[in-house]
């Protein structure tokens, strides 16, 4: 299945929540009515979504938030299920550990899509080594840096200014001047994703 390239606001309205696909400077929440579904009049009021529909919708929402396609998402779920602990929490921690997501969390990209592009274009390094695989899993203690030749990119400079103004998550440490950050640890489940109900995804794949 190809990656979705259409209007981001339409996706957010479909899922009923901000998917963080646009910069916080122009948050979709400021432009869209999440309760209104795509279409001229939206979904007919009073219709009830089935349990399967709710589970499928939650999976689609998380896939779109992290920019992951179905086949890869299934692999993440299988790995999460193999690991000790809560499968749903394991799944989200794997997604949070993706290099493109960490680059986004560190503020080098204003959106995950922009961060993914930076990784693909070799604009960042991991522990001094060039890594251009967005799905690369970052480990605690890894150092993510913007390459010297990329430090003058206006989109990175603007993204860092934005990150500085709204703050960074506790599990990363970033030197804004050096454009370098440390992935201190995988985040605790209660530190992110309050809008995600991962148990619905576990239920879907357990059918």
From Swiss-Prot:
Stored SMART domains: Ribosomal_S4, S4
In residue numbers, the region (Disordered) covers 22-54
Biological process (GO), any one: ribosomal small subunit biogenesis
Give residue ranges for domain S4 RNA-binding: 97-157
Biased composition range(s): Basic and acidic residues:
27-38
Q: Where is the composition biased (Polar residues)?
A: 42-52
InterPro entries xrefs: Ribosomal_uS4, Ribosomal_uS4_bac-type, Ribosomal_uS4_CS, Ribosomal_uS4_N, S4_RNA-bd, S4_RNA-bd_sf
Instruction: Give the source's domain of life in one word.
Output: Bacteria
Keywords (alphabetical) are:
Ribonucleoprotein, Ribosomal protein, RNA-binding, rRNA-binding
Q: Which molecular-function annotation in GO is an example for this chain?
A: structural constituent of ribosome
Q: Which GO terms describe its cellular component?
A: small ribosomal subunit
> What is the protein's known function?
One of the primary rRNA binding proteins, it binds directly to 16S rRNA where it nucleates assembly of the body of the 30S subunit.
By sequence similarity, the record places it as follows: Belongs to the universal ribosomal protein uS4 family.
Q: How does it assemble?
A: Part of the 30S ribosomal subunit. Contacts protein S5. The interaction surface between S4 and S5 is involved in control of translational fidelity.
Q: Can you say what this protein is called?
A: Small ribosomal subunit protein uS4
């Amino acid at each position: 299945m190809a990656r979705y390239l259409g209007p981001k606001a339409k996706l957010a309205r479909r899922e009923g929540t901000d998917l963080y696909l646009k910069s916080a400077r122009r948050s979709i929440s400021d432009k869209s009515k999440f309760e209104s579904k795509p279409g001229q009049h939206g979904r007919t009021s009073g219709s009830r979504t089935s349990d399967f529909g709710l589970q499928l919708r939650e999976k689609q929402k998380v896939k779109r938030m992290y920019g992951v396609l179905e086949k890869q998402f299934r692999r993440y779920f299988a790995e999460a299920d193999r690991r000790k602990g809560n499968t749903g929490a394991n799944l989200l921690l794997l997604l949070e550990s993706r290099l493109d997501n960490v680059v986004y969390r560190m503020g080098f990209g204003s959106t995950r899509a922009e961060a993914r592009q930076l990784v693909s274009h070799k604009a960042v390094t991991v522990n001094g080594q060039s890594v251009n695989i967005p799905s690369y899993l970052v480990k605690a203690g890894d150092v993510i840096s913007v390459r010297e030749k990329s430090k003058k990119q206006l989109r990175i400079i603007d993204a860092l200014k934005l990150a500085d103004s709204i703050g960074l998550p506790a599990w990363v440490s970033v030197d804004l001047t050096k454009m370098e950050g440390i992935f201190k640890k995988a985040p605790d489940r209660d530190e992110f994703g309050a809008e995600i109900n991962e148990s619905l995804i576990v239920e879907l794949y357990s059918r």
